[in-house]
C-alpha cells in the first residue's frame, strides 16, 4: 500500500480523460428509476404504495380538503379520531404538486403524477449528493463519483424508498442527511454552508426523528472540530449552531400549536426535540463566541462539558420520560401481535431469528465501509481529516441505529456509498485510474451482499434455524389499494379490519377504520385484536360497543398468530368459513383476496 497518500497520482486522476460523471449520472438515475418503477408500471402506482404511503396520501388529501394545518388527527382512524406523529413538512411539496396539476389533468391524474415524480426527484437529488460527497472526500476523482453513484443505485435497502408511490418521508430524510453530510464536510471553508447545514438538520428532525442519532453524531463532530481547531473554525461552528438554533425555533411555531411544546412528545418533533436542537445550537454558539475572545484548549473543553451538563440536566428535568423507547406506551397485546413482526422496526437480533439470510444485505456493506474509511482516515491528508471523521461518525451512528431498527439500514447504505468509493480512491489511487474501481464496487455493492446472503440461505438456515420467513408470509398478503377496491360499493361505515388493511381502506374508500400500523393508535389496534381473539358472545358485544358496520379480513393471508392463540376466537372461526349469526357475509371481491361481513343490527 505504498501509494496510500499519493497526491500526485490523485492529481493525475483528476485530469485523466474518461467517463464524465455529469453525463453518466442522468443515465444511472433514469436506469434506476425505471428498474424500481417496474412494479408500478405493471400494477399501477397506487398499488405500489406502502401502508405509510397510503396514509400520507390520506393526510395530504385531508389538508387539501380543508383540515387545519395544525390538525394532524386522522378522524377516520379509530373514530372519532387518532393523532398522527407526522408533520406537515412533506405534505407541502406533495400538496403543491397536486394543486398545480389538478386543473390540467384532474385529481386522480395529479395524484398519479405526484406519486411518480416526487420519489424520482428525490432519487435524482440523492444521486447528485452522493456524487458530490464522493468528489469532496476523494479530492475530485471522477471515477470515485461514478463509483459512488453506482453503489447508490445498487443500495438495495434504500431503493425501495425511492420507488414510484414512495411519498411517506423516509426518502426525504435520506436526502436531507446526505445534504447535511456534504455541507458539514465543508464547514471549515464556509460559514454560509455551515449555517445551511444547521438548517437542514432542523428540517430533517421536523419531518421525523428517525435520523436523530446520526444528526447528533454530526453535531458532536462539529463540536469536536471546534475543540480541536479553535479560533480558525469558531466563526463557522458558530454559524452552524446559529442555523441549527434559529431554524428549529422558527420551525416549531410554524408546525406545531404553541401549547403542545410543553408536552412530552417523544416520538416526533416537539418540546423535547426542540430543547435538544435549539439548546445544542445555542451551546455551539456560546462555545464559539467564548473561543473568539479567549482561545485555549482547556477553556474549549470546559465550555463544552458545561454546555453538555446544562443541556442534559434541562432535558432530564423536563422530559425524563423520553429516555424510554418511543414504543414503550404500546399495549403489550399490540406489541406481541403486530409491532414485534413489523419488518422495518426489527432489530438485528430479531432478523437473525426470523430472516438471517437478509442480514448481509442490510448490514454488510456499511460495516465493510467502516473498515475502509478508518484506513483512509489514517492515510489521508491532514487537511481532509475532519471530513473523514465526520463520515465515520455519521456512518457509525447509522449502523448502531440499524442494529436496533432495520429501516435505518437504508440511510446507512446511501451514506456508505460515497464514503466507500472515496476510501478506495484514497487507499489505491492507481485502482481509480480506470474501470477497475467501478468493477470492484459492483462486486462489493449492497446488492452483491444481498445476493450472497440469499444464495447462502440453505446454509444459513442450518446455522440459525429461523423461526419463520417474512417473504413467504407476505407473498399472498393484502398489501395494495386494489385489494380493498370492492369496498367502495358499500355505504360509508365503520370497519374493523386487520392492521395493515387500515391505511389502504382509508386511501381508497370513505370508510372509517379502527386499526392501522401506527404506535399512537393503541385504542383502535387493541379493539381489533380483542375482537379477533374473542369468543363469539364477547365479539358480538365488542362490535356493538364500537358500533362497527363491517368486519374485513385478508382471506389469502389469514392471521395465523391470532388463530393459534385463540382457536375459538372470531378470527379462527371466520378463517374456517364459519359465520356467526350477528354477521352477514358479503360477496364483493371477485379476486377473493378479502372477505367482508356486514354486522347485523
Where are these regions (language model features)?
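Active-site lumenal/periplasmic loops and adjacent helix-entry segments of GT-C-fold
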Residues: 38-138, 142-176, 204, 209
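Start-transfer (signal-anchor) and selected internal transmembrane alpha helices
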Residues: 1-41, 146, 289-307
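Extracytoplasmic
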Residues: 3-8, 445-601
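Hydrophobic/aromatic-rich transmembrane helices and adjacent perimembrane loops
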Residues: 364-369, 404-442
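Membrane-interface helix-loop-helix junctions at transmembrane boundaries of multi-pass membrane enzymes
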Residues: 230-238, 294-305, 320, 367-393
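Signature aromatic-anchored transmembrane alpha helix within multi-pass, membrane-resident enzymes
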Residues: 304-308, 426-459
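Membrane-embedded helix bundles of polyisoprenyl
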Residues: 28-33, 118-137, 143-188, 193-228, ...
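Juxtamembrane membrane-water interface segments that cap and precede transmembrane helices
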Residues: 102-108, 255-268, 328-364
Amino acid at each position: 500500500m505504498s501509494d496510500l497518500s499519493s497526491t500526485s497520482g490523485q492529481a493525475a486522476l483528476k485530469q485523466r480523460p474518461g467517463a464524465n460523471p455529469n453525463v453518466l449520472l442522468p443515465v444511472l438515475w433514469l436506469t434506476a428509476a425505471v428498474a424500481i418503477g417496474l412494479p408500478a408500471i405493471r400494477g399501477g402506482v397506487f398499488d405500489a404504495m406502502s401502508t405509510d404511503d397510503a396514509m400520507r396520501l390520506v393526510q395530504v388529501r385531508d389538508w387539501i380538503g380543508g383540515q387545519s394545518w395544525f390538525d394532524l388527527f386522522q378522524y377516520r382512524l379509530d373514530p372519532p379520531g387518532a393523532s398522527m406523529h407526522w408533520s406537515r413538512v412533506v405534505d407541502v411539496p406533495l400538496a403543491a404538486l397536486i394543486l398545480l396539476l389538478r386543473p390540467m389533468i384532474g385529481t386522480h391524474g395529479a395524484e398519479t403524477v405526484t406519486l411518480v415524480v416526487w420519489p424520482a426527484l428525490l432519487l435524482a437529488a440523492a444521486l447528485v449528493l452522493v456524487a458530490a460527497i464522493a468528489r469532496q472526500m476523494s479530492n475530485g476523482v471522477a471515477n470515485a463519483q461514478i463509483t459512488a453513484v453506482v453503489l447508490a443505485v445498487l443500495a438495495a435497502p434504500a431503493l425501495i424508498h425511492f420507488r414510484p408511490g414512495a411519498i411517506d418521508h423516509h426518502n426525504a430524510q435520506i436526502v436531507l442527511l446526505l445534504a447535511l453530510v456534504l455541507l458539514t464536510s465543508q464547514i471549515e471553508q464556509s460559514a454560509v454552508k455551515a449555517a445551511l447545514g444547521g438548517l437542514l438538520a432542523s428540517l430533517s428532525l421536523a419531518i421525523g426523528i428517525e435520523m436523530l442519532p446520526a444528526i447528533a453524531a454530526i453535531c458532536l463532530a462539529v463540536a469536536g472540530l471546534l475543540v480541536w481547531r479553535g479560533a480558525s473554525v469558531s466563526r463557522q461552528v458558530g454559524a452552524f449552531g446559529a442555523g441549527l438554533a434559529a431554524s428549529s425555533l422558527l420551525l416549531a411555531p410554524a408546525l406545531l400549536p404553541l401549547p403542545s411544546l410543553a408536552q412530552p412528545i417523544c416520538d416526533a418533533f416537539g418540546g423535547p426535540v426542540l430543547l435538544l436542537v435549539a439548546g445544542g445550537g445555542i451551546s455551539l454558539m456560546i462555545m464559539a463566541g467564548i473561543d473568539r475572545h479567549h482561545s485555549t484548549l482547556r477553556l474549549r473543553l470546559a465550555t463544552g462539558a458545561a454546555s453538555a451538563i446544562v443541556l442534559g440536566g434541562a432535558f432530564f428535568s423536563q422530559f425524563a420520560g423520553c429516555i424510554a423507547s418511543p414504543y414503550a406506551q404500546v399495549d403489550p397485546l399490540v406489541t406481541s401481535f403486530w409491532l414485534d413482526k413489523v419488518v422495518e422496526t426489527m432489530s438485528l437480533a430479531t432478523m437473525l431469528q426470523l430472516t438471517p439470510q437478509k442480514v448481509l444485505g442490510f448490514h454488510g456493506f456499511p460495516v465493510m465501509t467502516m473498515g475502509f474509511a478508518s484506513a483512509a482516515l489514517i492515510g489521508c491528508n491532514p487537511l481532509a481529516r475532519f471530513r473523514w471523521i465526520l463520515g465515520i461518525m455519521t456512518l457509525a451512528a447509522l449502523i448502531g441505529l440499524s442494529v436496533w431498527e432495520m429501516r435505518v439500514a437504508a440511510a446507512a447504505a446511501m451514506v456508505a456509498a460515497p464514503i466507500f468509493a472515496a476510501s478506495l480512491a484514497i487507499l489505491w489511487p492507481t485502482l481509480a485510474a480506470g474501470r477497475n474501481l467501478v468493477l470492484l464496487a459492483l462486486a462489493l455493492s449492497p446488492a452483491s451482499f444481498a445476493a450472497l446472503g440469499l444464495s447462502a440461505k440453505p446454509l444459513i438456515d442450518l446455522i440459525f434455524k429461523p423461526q419463520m420467513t417474512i417473504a413467504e408470509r407476505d407473498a399472498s398478503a393484502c398489501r395494495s389499494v386494489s385489494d380493498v377496491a370492492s369496498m367502495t360499493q358499500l355505504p360509508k361505515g365503520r370497519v374493523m379490519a386487520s392492521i395493515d388493511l387500515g391505511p389502504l381502506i382509508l386511501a381508497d374508500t370513505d370508510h372509517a377504520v379502527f386499526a392501522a400500523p401506527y404506535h399512537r393508535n393503541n385504542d383502535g389496534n387493541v379493539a381489533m385484536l380483542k375482537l379477533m381473539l374473542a369468543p363469539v358472545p364477547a365479539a358480538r358485544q365488542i362490535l356493538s360497543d364500537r358500533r362497527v358496520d363491517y368486519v374485513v379480513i385478508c382471506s389469502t393471508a389469514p392471521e395465523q398468530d391470532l388463530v393459534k392463540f385463540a382457536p375459538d376466537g372470531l378470527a379462527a372461526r371466520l378463517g374456517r368459513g364459519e359465520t356467526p349469526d350477528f354477521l352477514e357475509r358479503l360477496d364483493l371481491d371477485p379476486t377473493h383476496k378479502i372477505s367482508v361481513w356486514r354486522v347485523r343490527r
